[in-house]
Amino acid sequence: MEFNHVPVLLEETIENLNIKEDGIYVDCTLGGAGHSSEILKRLSSKGRLIGIDQDKDALKAASERLKEYKNLTFVHDNFSNIKNILEELKIDKVDGILADLGVSSYQLDEPERGFSYMNDAPLDMRMNRDSEFSAYDVINGYDEEKLYSIIKNYGEEKFAKRIAKFIVEKRSEEAINTTFELVDIIKAAIPAKFRRQGPHPAKRTFQAIRIEVNQELEILNKTIEDSVDKLKSEGRICIITFHSLEDRIVKNKYRELQDPCMCPKDIPMCVCGKKPKIKIITRKPIEASSYELEYNPRSRSAKLRVAEKINL
């Protein structure tokens, strides 16, 4: 099994992590280990990297790719559990944390995973294959209102109501089992003139279902705060997002952690006692260069936001 994954914003991420050779770093989304391999190159034997992934295929491939390194610990888990993971490893604080929230190239390119609307496969979309809940359960189990809600909110799809209606109508005849069956339903629901414009008509709906299956947005807010709590002073957190929903959450959470004061604006001094935990390094997100876009088109929607822990 070959886990091909071209890391996005690699140089920008490594630069912004401010890697110390004896530091401890966490790659929350190990994936193809593109970012991790570059971190490890910059660590001494006293440094350490913790690589977390909920996808066993990714961990297996990464362990093979990084087998020469002895200062690396693999963890099969969701990065939302970062506090517990580090506590179990007897690690109090770390120097840097990276999270690349995109679906890996491998997951998209491996048809059987069901992430892609370009290949026919069972409706799956589980990043953690140990989980029992899959895209099949969403498509065949959610009522019309709930389907509409996730497609609208997570996919930002203007035809969410029609798509939800068409899904429910189709599954009343027989279960919807495959990605291509779902693609056909989506295409039928979207008026022809809109199908001919812009990205693939199924893109937004597939994104929405994937987010729901893996509970991606629900865990992000808390995970950012937990991650910041585990950073040393001047430690950095780098988060790469791939759609506006994630980016908005990261941006707003960073702002909240930089300026948590809840006092009314007309009070001359803070009395709520909430102190800033970070300073935002990237006022605007870092995006892929024109050069990177040429060799890695999947970087087109990537945005990197960086924050630094401050002394409390």
From Swiss-Prot:
The gene is rsmH. It comes from Clostridium acetobutylicum (strain ATCC 824 / DSM 792 / JCM 1419 / IAM 19013 / LMG 5710 / NBRC 13948 / NRRL B-527 / VKM B-1787 / 2291 / W). Belongs to the methyltransferase superfamily. RsmH family. It comes from the Bacteria. HAMAP family: 16SrRNA_methyltr_H. Pfam families: Methyltransf_5. Specifically methylates the N4 position of cytidine in position 1402 (C1402) of 16S rRNA. It is an enzyme of class 2 (transferase). GO terms for biological process: rRNA base methylation. Coiled coil: none annotated. This is Ribosomal RNA small subunit methyltransferase H. InterPro entries: RsmH, SAM-dep_MeTrfase_MraW_recog, SAM-dependent_MTases_sf. The keyword GTP-binding does not apply.
